[in-house]
Design a protein with these regions (language model features):
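Glycine-rich phosphate/adenosyl-contacting loop at the front of the ribokinase-like
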Residues: 1-56, 65-66, 242, 310-316
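Hydrophobic anchor at the start of a short beta-strand
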Residues: 2, 52-54, 78, 162, ...
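Short beta-strand scaffold segments in enzyme catalytic cores
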Residues: 44, 89-93, 226-230
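Conserved N-terminal subdomain of the carbohydrate kinase-like
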Residues: 47-130, 300-316
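Short, small-residue-enriched loops and turns at beta-alpha junctions
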Residues: 108-111, 139-143, 170-173, 191, ...
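Short acidic, glycine-rich surface-loop motifs adjacent to enzyme active sites
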Residues: 127-142
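Conserved phosphate/ATP/ADP-binding segment of small-molecule kinases
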Residues: 146-162, 166-233
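Conserved phosphate-binding/catalytic region of the ribokinase-like
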Residues: 172, 200-316
Length: 316
C-alpha cells in the first residue's frame, strides 16, 4: 500500500485544439475530465497497476464531489477531508504535436481546522503501515510551507519511507527534514539550488549536493531527456522515445508512480528508474491526464545507463 497526500487536488479538464492563437475563438476537437493533482495522479497510476493506494485530500463543493466519484471509480481508496471551499478546476489546452498550455486555479483557502484535519488524515493513514507515503503538489493559499516537512518528520518517526514532489519553499523545507526521495523536474531543481543547470553534469552536481543535506534519493525528471537518478552510491539515466506525444500533463507523476511501484515490489533503484521512465513515456502518449495501465507501458523500450554522458545539454 502507498499513501498519497494531495493538499491541493483538482478537476483537470483537457481540451484538444488544432492550434492555439491568442485572442481567437477555438473549437475543441476533443475533451475529457480527469481527477487531478500530483498525488491524485500517483494514486491513479498505482491503482491502474494493481497496487492499493490511499489518497488523502481535501474535498469540497461540486468539484470535490466529482473528484471523489472519479477517483473512487479508478480503484483508489479516498480519505476525503471535508472543506468549506470548492476543489479547484484546471484547464489544459493541447495541440496536435503535444504542446500543452495549462491554466491552474490557486485552489481553496483551508481553515486552521481543515488543515488540522488534513494532517490528521495523513497521520491516520501512516498508522496503516504503508510501504511509502508521498506528499505531492502545490499548497493551497495560506497553508504553511512546512506542511511537507512535517509529513517527512512524521513518516520517519513511524518508520515509513517518504517521498516529496513539490517546488519552491515547500520543497526546500522538506529537503531540510531529510526525505527518502524527492522528484523535482529540471526547473524545480534549478530553483531549489539557485543556479542554472544547462547540462546533465550540472543536474548531477545539484542532485549530489542534496544528498549531503539528508535526502537519500533524487530522481530528476527531464522531459524529453528522460530522468536522472542519484543516490549515495549510484547514478543512472533513463530515456524513452515517444513516437506520438499527446499530452505531457501528469507525465512526471506517472514517472514517480512507476518508480515507487517498482521499489515497493522489490526492484533495485536502477530498474525502478527504468520502470518510472516507461510509465512517464506511456503517459505522454495518452490523452489528457490519463494514467497508463500495464498495457500502455508494456513494450516501451527504455535506454538505461549507469554511465550517462554528463556533457549532454538539456535544451528546453
Amino acid at each position: 500500500m502507498i499513501v498519497t497526500l494531495t493538499p491541493n487536488p483538482s478537476i483537470d479538464r483537457t481540451v484538444s485544439i488544432s492550434h492555439l492563437e491568442r485572442g481567437e475563438v477555438h473549437r475543441a476537437t476533443a475533451s475529457r475530465v480527469d481527477p487531478g493533482g500530483k498525488g491524485v495522479n500517483v494514486s491513479r497510476a498505482l491503482a491502474a497497476h494493481g497496487l492499493h493506494s490511499v489518497a488523502v485530500l481535501p474535498a469540497g463543493g461540486a468539484e470535490g464531489a466529482l473528484l471523489e466519484r472519479l477517483l473512487t471509480s479508478t480503484g483508489v481508496e479516498v480519505l476525503p477531508v471535508p472543506i468549506g471551499g470548492s476543489v479547484r478546476a484546471n484547464v489544459a489546452l493541447v495541440e496536435p504535436d503535444g504542446t500543452t498550455t495549462k491554466i491552474n486555479e490557486p485552489g481553496p483557502t483551508l481553515s486552521t481546522a481543515e488543515l488540522s484535519s488534513l494532517v490528521a488524515g495523513a497521520a491516520t493513514a501512516l498508522m496503516r503501515g504503508p510501504s511509502w507515503v508521498v506528499g505531492c503538489g502545490s499548497l493551497p493559499p495560506g497553508v504553511d510551507d512546512e506542511l511537507y516537512a512535517g509529513l517527512v518528520r512524521r513518516a520517519r518517526a513511524a518508520g515509513v519511507r517518504v517521498a516529496v514532489d513539490t517546488s519552491g519553499v515547500p520543497l526546500a523545507r522538506a529537503v531540510a527534514a531529510g526525505p527518502d526521495l524527492i522528484k523535482p523536474n529540471h526547473e524545480e531543481l534549478a530553483e531549489l539550488v539557485g543556479a542554472a543547470l544547462p547540462t546533465l553534469a550540472d543536474v548531477h552536481t545539484a542532485a549530489k549536493s542534496l544528498l549531503g543535506q539528508g535526502v537519500r534519493t533524487v530522481v530528476v525528471s527531464l522531459g524529453r531527456h528522460g530522468a536522472l537518478l542519484v543516490t549515495d552510491g549510484l547514478t543512472a539515466h533513463g530515456q524513452a522515445v515517444v513516437d506520438q506525444p499527446l499530452s505531457t500533463v501528469g507525465a512526471g507523476d506517472a514517472l514517480l508512480a512507476g518508480y515507487l511501484h517498482a521499489t515497493a515490489t522489490g526492484s533495485a533503484p536502477g530498474a525502478a528508474l527504468a520502470a518510472g521512465v516507461a510509465w512517464g513515456a506511456a503517459a505522454v502518449g495518452l490523452p489528457g491526464s490519463r494514467m497508463p495501465a500495464p498495457g500502455d507501458v508494456h513494450g516501451i523500450p527504455v535506454l538505461l545507463t549507469h554511465h550517462p554522458d554528463l556533457t549532454l545539454r538539456l535544451a528546453p
